[in-house]
Swiss-Prot record:
The gene is metE. It comes from Thermococcus kodakarensis (strain ATCC BAA-918 / JCM 12380 / KOD1). Its EC number is 2.1.1.-. Binds 1 zinc ion per subunit. Its cofactor is Zn(2+). Keywords: Amino-acid biosynthesis, Metal-binding, Methionine biosynthesis, Methyltransferase, Transferase, Zinc. This is Methionine synthase.
């Protein structure tokens, strides 16, 4: 499979339509049948896919329309987790933090139905499936059963490995593991690395790893130890400063974040193009994918869409420059 040079993608989440948020509220109040809720999620999924395609995104996803939160969605489907109620994260934001109260077991598919639906309803040949990684789920859960976080993370890796194999069997070609908590504790990074490697073992798809708002110099020390083909990292939020850690990314691909998901200001195409030219001082364009810094769900939907539109326009500016050098496409590589 071939892709245009500098393929564009999203990281995962996208703002939910207001009417879907109302469906979530009605469901929580017990006033919406589950069948109606699922239909609403699927309708929103198709609407978001069309937005991404209209913006020009090469590798889309449905913006996680069926996911209320990036860990709760998964822990609710894994046997051995229990919920005591919502906890406060910041401000007025809450989430249901799960507790591991018995040995974790694979009970049901985690994202298989999502993948099937997106695959059936996109016009794109390649889609990327985002899944929260084993260490982040362990870090963001209470541990009331296992002797250590390491043991908990490794059992989660086994469960994810089963899911990854199911996705491969269904035709998935690109899976992104989201590990925002991976670098929270520098003395535990090796645990996260081993958990990721156990999760991907024996699965022959392209794996990416997304880590955001962290010490990338610490991550860079492990670039060659993590068995993934691509690292999707944010850079716009830090104003593209201090990219020297990329010197250690010698052969893997980089998913480069060029729009800030925490700032409602819409970047211009020229700003995006300038950022891409800067990162090409470190990474050749054949190893570059372009994406937002992180998930877009906290933004107004209109702003999120315009950020994607301008991101693609900025990419097209650089593509025209690269075309003059005869660089127009790259192969879709599952392993690098």
């Amino acid at each position: 499979m071939e892709l245009p040079i500098l393929p564009t993608s999203i990281i995962g989440s996208y703002p939910k339509p207001r009417w879907l948020l109302r469906m979530y509220n009605l469901r929580e109040l017990g006033r919406l049948p589950e069948e109606d809720f699922r239909e609403a999620v699927r309708d929103a999924s198709v609407a978001v896919l069309r937005e991404h395609e209209r913006a020009g995104i090469d590798i889309p996803w449905d913006g996680e329309m069926g996911r209320s939160e990036m860990t709760e969605y998964f822990t609710a489907k894994i046997a051995g987790f229990k919920f005591y109620g919502p906890i406060r994260v910041w401000g007025n934001a809450y989430f249901n933090k799960a507790a591991a109260v018995s040995k974790l077991e694979y009970r049901e598919p985690l994202v298989l139905d999502e993948f099937r639906w997106v695959k059936e309803n996109t016009t794109r040949e390649i889609i990327k499936v985002p899944i929260t990684g084993p260490y982040t789920i362990a870090e963001w859960s209470f541990n009331e059963y296992y002797s250590s976080k390491e043991e908990l993370a490794f059992d989660l890796a086994k469960i994810l490995n089963k899911e990854f194999k199911l996705l491969e069997k269904e035709g998935a070609t690109f899976i992104q593991i989201d590990e925002p908590a991976m670098l929270n504790h520098p003395d535990e990074v090796s645990i996260a690395v081993e958990a990721i490697n156990r999760a991907v073992k024996g699965v022959k798809v392209k794996f990416g790893l997304h880590v955001c708002y962290s010490n990338y110099y610490l991550l860079a020390d492990y670039f060659d130890d993590i068995k993934v083909s691509q690292f999707a990292l944010e850079a716009a939020n830090r104003n593209f400063r201090d990219l020297d850690y990329l010197k250690k990314l010698t052969h893997q691909e980089l998913g480069f974040g060029v729009v800030d998901v925490h700032n409602p200001r819409v970047e211009s195409p020229e700003e995006v193009a300038k950022a891409i030219r800067k990162v090409m001082e470190y990474i050749e364009p054949e190893r570059l994918y372009i994406n937002p810094d992180c998930g877009l769900k906290l933004l107004d939907r209109r702003i999120a869409y315009q950020k994607l539109v301008n991101m693609v326009k900025g990419v097209e500016i650089v593509r025209r420059e690269l075309a003059r050098e005869g660089k127009t496409s790259i192969p879709f590589r599952r392993e690098v």
